[in-house]
Amino acid sequence: VLVHDRVQPDVPRDTVAVCVEEAREFAPDMVIGIGGGSCLDMAKCAALLISHGGLLQDYYGEFKVPGPTLPLIAVPTTAGTGSEVTPVAVISDPDRTMKVGISSPHLIAAAAICDPELTMTCPPGLTAIAGADALTHAVEAFTAARRGTDPGLPQQH
């Protein structure tokens, strides 16, 4: 078992490269992400780059992941991001000074283990932020306008 426990909030792009370099030497059969949304997004990005190589920025946008990645098991310890069930990983790109997304059905976890007991040790402030995040996602999903299917569209904003 190889443990990478240096995940930072909003997953800085360059930290993914450090994780992947360590993991490649280990040659894992699967990736398990345990933690909040950033930990799960890091796990998705690690599974992607271990499987397909290249640079993370090669996959920005939608449908650029060429095929299945290493199996991913997602174990959320906060409630709010929904990363354990979405086809999206969000990272911070210092060159763009913004968050960017990678979206592909190949990023969906093979299994999500959602145990509410794991959220019980979260600090109250983090629990409140995660709850607000969940509410924001729900409102956004309900009110968002439909958009075209152009895969480059997310990168044009």
Annotate the PLM regions.
Residues 14-117:
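Glycine/threonine-rich beta-strand-loop-alpha-helix active-site module
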Residues 88-157:
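Carboxylate- and glycine-rich phosphate/diphosphate-binding segment that chelates Mg2+/Mn2+
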Residues 1-4, 21:
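An N-terminal, well-structured beta->alpha segment
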Residues 3-13:
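Short beta->alpha junction loops
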